[in-house]
């Protein structure tokens, strides 16, 4: 959203990332203000790539290329959320195993695969050679290594290649981060068609999507020992196992666009906007987390959403308004017209 509406501020963000790398040897993953042990993934690569792919310039992009390559193959010696915890396993096996003492391993694997795709896209935009890019293009497909055809879900995997058993799609935490397999299976932002193919086509894919809403908001909180607030929010929202109060699944509804059922996306998007973003004391649906939850609303209210940052593409949803005009910094206007738009249409 910042790249679209406030590109001048985005330049400053990129300059800040350069400075963080120069001063610490790592890009920040959860800065407050220094490196903090929080969350998983190497998503600074996404922030860097999305800015450059969307035309943001005026900073040292080559230094950021050096940084994303460096961070993909090391971990901070004191802050394990910075860089890539488990990178040695990931580079060798194509996934972070669930039985080597690394928590939230499946979530890490899925995010690293997307991060590798971001590195590939960033390098491609910079004009890097195919020999430099090919390892990251291949690694972007590592999400396939966690797909368990028995369940049609992403499942933690042991170092010897076997899938974790016993397995419950309702178990929060463990191999995942503040969520369960029903949430994280869809974390293939960069290759929805590949995930559709794994599941056997549009129909089984859409049926699996439907199941997220149809399965009651039951849960297994044994990893935490108590229901964390994200679990409680899922229960209160009462949209099955859809947990909009936390970020891992917020792109999920838009995936109906990929399997030929955009009307389902439109209905669910409007339901979320109407129910979980209101001017009431309990009118906000969960974590804000660096602006993501509100950015989801702003994009969705305008009628489109960036399912995959760094792709330069937007999925079509349903605007709240019949006419939306965005005044671009260039002086041009971006306009969305939906004259027949209504609560029923």
Give, region by region, the residue ranges found by the protein language model.
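Core alpha-helical transmembrane segments of integral membrane proteins
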Residues: 1-2
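Active-site-surrounding "flap" and adjacent substrate/cofactor-binding loops of secreted or lumenal enzymes
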Residues: 7-32, 217-224, 230
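Generic internal hydrophobic packing segments that stabilize the cores of diverse globular domains
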Residues: 10-14, 45, 49, 65
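Active-site core of glycosidic bond-cleaving carbohydrate-active enzymes
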Residues: 18, 45, 55-141, 145-335, ...
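Aromatic/His-enriched, Gly/Pro-containing loop or helix-boundary segments
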Residues: 24-44, 49-53
């Amino acid at each position: 959203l910042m790249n679209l509406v406030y590109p001048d501020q985005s330049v400053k963000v990129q300059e800040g990332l350069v400075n963080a790398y120069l001063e610490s040897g790592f890009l920040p993953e959860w800065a407050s203000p220094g490196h903090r042990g929080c969350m998983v993934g190497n998503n600074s690569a996404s922030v860097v790539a999305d800015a450059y792919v969307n035309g943001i310039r005026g900073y040292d992009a080559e230094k950021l290329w050096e940084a994303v390559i460096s961070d993909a193959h090391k971990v901070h010696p004191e802050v394990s959320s910075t860089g890539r915890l488990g990178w040695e396993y990931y580079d060798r096996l194509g996934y972070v195993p669930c039985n080597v003492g690394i928590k939230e391993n499946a979530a890490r694997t899925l995010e690293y695969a997307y991060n590798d795709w971001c590195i590939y896209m960033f390098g491609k935009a910079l004009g890097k050679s195919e020999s430099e890019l090919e390892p990251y293009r291949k690694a972007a497909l590592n999400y396939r290594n966690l797909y368990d055809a028995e369940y049609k879900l992403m499942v933690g995997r042991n170092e010897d290649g076997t899938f974790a058993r016993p397995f419950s799609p309702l178990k929060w935490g463990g191999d995942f981060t503040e969520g369960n397999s029903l949430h994280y299976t869809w974390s293939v932002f960069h290759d929805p068609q590949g995930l559709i193919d794994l599941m056997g086509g549009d129909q089984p894919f859409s049926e699996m999507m439907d199941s997220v809403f149809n399965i009651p908001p039951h849960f297994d909180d044994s990893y935490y020992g108590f229901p964390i607030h994200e679990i409680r929010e899922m229960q209160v929202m009462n949209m099955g196992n859809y947990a909009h109060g936390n970020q891992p699944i917020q792109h999920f509804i838009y995936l109906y666009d990929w399997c030929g059922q955009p009307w389902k996306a439109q209905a669910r998007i409007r339901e979320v906007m109407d129910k979980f973003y209101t001017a009431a004391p309990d009118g906000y649906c969960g974590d804000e987390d660096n602006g993501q939850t509100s950015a989801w609303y702003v994009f969705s209210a305008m009628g489109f959403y960036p399912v995959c940052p760094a792709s330069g593409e937007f999925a079509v949803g349903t605007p709240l308004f019949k006419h939306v005009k965005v005044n671009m910094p260039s002086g041009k206007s971006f306009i969305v017209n939906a004259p027949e738009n209504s609560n029923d249409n």
